[in-house]
Amino acid sequence: MSEQKKVVLAYSGGLDTSVAIKWLQEQGYNVIACCLDVGEGKDLAFVQQKALEVGATNSYVIDAKEEFAQDYALISLQAHTMYEGKYPLVSALSRPLIAKKLVEIAEKEDAQAIAHGCTGKGNDQVRFEVSIKSLNPDLEVIAPVREWQWSREEEIEYAASRGIPIPINLDSPYSIDQNLWGRANECGILEDPWAAPPEGAYDLTAPLEKTPDTPEVIEIAFEQGVPVSIDGVSYSLSELILKLNEMAGAHGVGRIDHVENRLVGIKSREVYECPGAMTLIKAHKELEDLTLVKEVAHFKPIIEQKMSEIIYNGLWFSPLKDALHAFLKETQKHVTGIVRVKLFKGHAIVEGRKSEYSLYDEKLATYTKDDAFDHHAAIGFIELWGLPTKVNSIVKKKEQIKA
């Protein structure tokens, strides 16, 4: 008798992946569950036990918050990744890390396959499967939800017939994904792009009507592009991001309502909450404005846009992403300093920045008697700078005379 095949399942503890355990067993697999906490606050012990009770032969739970912060969210921060100028890549950032852990466990357990709970309509199926195949091309990838194509009612009926616990929040109209970089929400009334998102769709941010009437001013310190403290108190990166989620979220910072172009070819209306991410990106950009030379500052946004597209499109483990990341790391060597930010009524407003590597020279910028700028040097500069345009104009006038 041949040995039963093994599959590692990306397990969330919800209905879809709980049903997937039983379904995969019925397809002849031993199911090994794997759940990561990337900052959404999962009860890992509960999820681990639930997977075993549903039928998994083994259940891994991994606290990956700091790894996610250091190796994934930090790249998003330093690259100011804003897909289509609005979305700081919440879900897109966690998928490659989850895929990496799934592959590691599959190799450890000698599993032949990896399974995920994505539908055939979203971006995540692409991100998971491209990442998995990039890391180990020999692993089979199974997508139970995409394969069975059941209605919600059929799925519940299947679960009930096999004794699978049905979550108490099943009646929620929303589909939510969350990590320390933010919260993504879709479905329900949000599918109508004209409908205003109800307050029930939000969790990390306060409505403007209920935010404090007094601004909160904070100071964020960076070392080589990495945020290290708030108001002089040091934190690990994951702790700092979560702390800023609380602080900025209380002031309503970071709400994003976005009709985006999905990788699979459709438009989708998403509501995001990214209070910590949006505050950090704004502060980091202001510190770069102080410390990067003009040529790098003007070229970097081109890299940022491409990096945003690559990550959104599931190409985290691509050679191009690695090459762009190498450029990015080079730009961060002198992005060290402190940024003062005012949090107030949905805004994170930068009010000051300072750095030992500042390229701002007040004596060159001032219009007072302390002005050290050589105004006479401007005469020759203007002549040479405008020379090509001047020559072009002279030639055109000669052509007009001939005509």
Curated annotation (Swiss-Prot):
SUPFAM superfamilies: Adenine nucleotide alpha hydrolases-like, Argininosuccinate synthetase, C-terminal domain. Pathway: Amino-acid biosynthesis; L-arginine biosynthesis; L-arginine from L-ornithine and carbamoyl phosphate: step 2/3. ATP binds at residues 10-18, 117. GO terms for molecular function: argininosuccinate synthase activity; ATP binding. One of its GO terms (biological process) is argininosuccinate metabolic process. It catalyses: L-citrulline + L-aspartate + ATP = 2-(N(omega)-L-arginino)succinate + AMP + diphosphate + H(+). Transmembrane segments: none annotated. It is found in: Cytoplasm. One of its GO terms (cellular component) is cytoplasm. L-citrulline binds at residues 87, 123, 127, 175, 260, 272. Coiled coil: none annotated. InterPro entries: Arginosuc_syn_C (IPR048268), Arginosuc_syn_N (IPR048267), Arginosuc_synth (IPR001518), Arginosuc_synth_CS (IPR018223), Arginosuc_synth_type_1_subfam (IPR023434), AS_cat/multimer_dom_body (IPR024074), Rossmann-like_a/b/a_fold (IPR014729). CDD domains: ASS (cd01999). Gene3D superfamilies: Argininosuccinate synthetase, chain A, domain 2, HUPs, Single helix bin. Its EC number is 6.3.4.5. L-aspartate binds at residues 119, 123-124. Pfam families: Arginosuc_syn_C, Arginosuc_synth. Keywords: Amino-acid biosynthesis, Arginine biosynthesis, ATP-binding, Cytoplasm, Ligase, Nucleotide-binding. Homotetramer. Belongs to the argininosuccinate synthase family. Type 1 subfamily. NCBIfam families: argG, PRK00509.1. This is Argininosuccinate synthase. The lineage of its organism: Bacteria, Bacillati, Bacillota, Bacilli, Bacillales.
